[in-house]
A protein has these predicted regions:
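Glycine-rich phosphate/cofactor-binding loops in nucleotide/flavin-utilizing enzymes
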Residues: 2-5, 74, 242, 343-387
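A short, Trp-centered hydrophobic/proline-enriched beta-strand micro-motif
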Residues: 122-130
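C-terminal helix-coil-helix/basic helical segment that borders enzyme active sites and/or dimer interfaces
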Residues: 25-36, 267, 271-279, 294-327, ...
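A short core secondary-structure module
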Residues: 154-200
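N-terminal glycine-rich flavin-associated loop
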Residues: 24, 87-110, 136
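Amphipathic, small/basic residue-rich leader segments at the start of a protein or domain
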Residues: 1-92, 114, 118, 334, ...
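Glycine-rich beta->alpha junctions and the first turn(s) of the following alpha-helix
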Residues: 3-7, 12, 199-298, 364, ...
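A structural signal for short hydrophobic beta-strand segments in well-ordered beta-sheet cores
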Residues: 144-147
Length: 387
């Protein structure tokens, strides 16, 4: 893809950068761990809603901005590079990339009319409920079931590690509706948080992305009308794949932005820190570390934006998405470890910028699909494409 940006895109990036610096960063300090309806989290969310950052990929007719995936990524990368909290941005991204886009692209006319404007305006927060105690990377081994009756679908099961669960108003829940193997026996449902039989539990504290609330959901014959079936019976796999394409590109732009900020911090440090009578950067080992950090950042960025461009062009390459996602996660963690070493003893302090950056990047190796699983999927897809 071309790295050149149009005047409109430059303005979009500048606006996002200013919003992060002037609005989000001053509010971050008051958001507590887990962000369970804390004043800081809600203040950041409401500010994003007022500035129309809660419906970036949704159509203007639905109250959104109508941005492409690539332009959404530019917004999130710019905010993270400016210093906005990656955890909060992750929460904001899940709402849009994992949920709102699926409702917009796969939902029925009635579903879109009911939910999209609320989601674009930020008054309805979305969450995607997929993982289970015995079904993590083995997604389609899920045991949650939806039983059809004249009244609708009664859903029973447990979902865990759900980003946005404590603050969500609407869940997209994947559940088994048949005995067909793999994805073909899975359907997806729109389940409001107020549904009888649905219980939300706050998740345990995380080392990183602390301002991204997460938790679990228990469903005890939670009844939803048949009109809440998203994507048709047996269509849950397609909904999940669509969500993952957007999520793995959109959310990982946050990691790119955080890598950019960390790289800038490291560059300034090695330029001004003096040891043995000369700046750190004059040491060959330090210079090599800085060069490798920049190489990882730029290579990761190219992979991720190329994968997104293919999605925007209507020709998604799932292998490219998996490879990009995996490489961004690995590169972010590698840069985090390098940053700690460059800052020395100060770099391992709990509240040092290097430690916070590394802790925020570690989840990107696991969330939205573990790194090694992504490589396995990508290889399988490439073998299938080149028999």
């Amino acid at each position: 893809m071309s790295s050149k940006r149009t005047a409109d895109q430059e303005a979009l990036v500048a606006e996002a950068r200013s919003f992060a610096r002037d609005t989000l960063i001053p509010l971050t300090g008051s958001a507590d761990e887990g962000a369970l309806a804390s004043a800081g989290y809600r203040a950041m969310w409401d500010a994003c809603a007022a500035a129309r950052y809660t419906g970036l990929p949704l159509s203007t007719s639905a109250g959104g901005r109508g941005l492409s995936l690539t332009d959404c990524m530019r917004v999130f990368e710019s905010m993270a590079a400016a210093g906005a909290d990656p955890g909060f941005l992750f929460s904001l991204g899940v709402h849009q990339f994992a949920v709102a886009v699926s409702v917009a692209s796969i939902g029925s006319e009635d579903q879109r009319a009911q939910w999209l404007r609320q989601m674009a305006e930020g008054s309805c927060i979305g969450a995607l409920a997929v993982s289970e105690p015995d079904a993590g990377s083995d997604t389609y081994a899920m045991k949650t079931r939806a039983e059809e009756s004249a009244d609708g679908f009664a859903i029973s099961g447990e979902k865990i590690w759900i980003s946005n669960a404590p603050v969500a108003d609407l869940f997209v829940v994947l559940a088994r509706t048949g005995d067909a193997p793999g994805m073909f026996g899975i359907s997806s449902f729109l389940v409001p948080s107020t549904t009888k039989g649905l219980t939300i539990e706050r998740g345990p504290a995380k080392a990183g992305l602390r301002n991204a609330p997460w938790g679990s959901v228990r469903l005890d014959r939670a009844l939803v009308p048949k009109s809440n079936l998203l994507g048709g019976l047996g269509g849950g796999g397609a909904v999940f794949q669509s969500s993952m394409r957007w999520e793995r590109c959109g959310l990982f732009a946050i990691a790119l932005g955080a890598m950019r900020k960390s790289f800038g911090d490291c560059l300034a440090h090695v330029r001004h820190r003096t040891q043995f009578g000369k700046p750190l950067v004059d040491n060959d080992v330090v210079a090599r570390s800085i060069a490798l950090m920049k190489t990882r950042l730029e290579a990761a960025r190219l992979l991720l934006y190329d994968a997104a461009a293919a999605i925007d062009d209507g020709e998604p390459d799932d292998a490219a998405v998996c490879l990009a996602k995996a490489y961004v996660g690995e590169s972010a963690v590698a840069n985090g470890l390098a940053a700690q070493e460059l800052f020395g003893a100060a770099g391992v302090l709990e509240q040092s910028s290097a430690t916070i950056f590394l802790n925020d990047m570690l989840p990107f190796r696991v969330l939205s699909g573990a790194t090694d699983v992504q490589y396995k999927i990508a290889t399988r897809l490439m073998l299938r494409a080149h028999p």
